[in-house]
């Protein structure tokens, strides 16, 4: 009993509380707020998430806000305990290669060894395991549209049917922006190579080993791996657990919050305590009724 009272007293103290909170943040879950519209369709600006820190191993613990590691990266893979790698199609939280203290959330489009094409039609994926096996494609991507490039079978928008939040604008503005950057000598601002293939211009990238090509579900309003490159495993933080709170922000187009200040900071009750899978079920129901 004396031991339990001592434990209770420690946990009730300021020092004990701080240590417990830090342990939770280091090893279990951390709260983040989504500021941008890059994942709109699935996750919205103003969504407040708990991120599961142990989805892909345990990242090196960092002091919140200043992002200072509390220990060296002995394995040089950014993780105290190495774990599973993000799978294709999963929503992942990570630190992008061009930042050190910012956290992004995107969908993992491709893994190491895969080949990616970004065209005026959308994204194409050539999974490295498939080779040229049509049976592999039909088994893993049933009913998907395919196209042959460089003698290889590529799958068009492979996750769109399963994840209904993924969408493009009709005119694919991002493709034209990237084409403009590439032709004006600003290739340093994009990570994909502009090439001529089968009579059309496409952007191509082969993903390096243990790296991941991260793309926003709002394909035409997303700063992602098309611009700053694929993400190494050492930068992977975790996966969204659930939305614990959600507010409309100034950039919330659905309620025209920029022009109507009264529409800012409205609570989105229907999004609270929903996982990504739960939010996708809502999207499917909404689409089914329209």
Curated annotation (Swiss-Prot):
Main subcellular location: membrane
Top-rank lineage group of the source organism: Bacteria
Catalysed reactions, semicolon-separated: Cleavage of hydrophobic, N-terminal signal or leader sequences from secreted and periplasmic proteins
Protein localization: Cell membrane
Pfam family, one: Peptidase_S26
Catalytic residues (positions): 38, 106
Residues that span the membrane, as ranges: 14-34
Protein EC: 3.4.21.89
Protein name stated in the entry: Signal peptidase I
Protein's organism: Helicobacter pylori (strain J99 / ATCC 700824) (Campylobacter pylori J99)
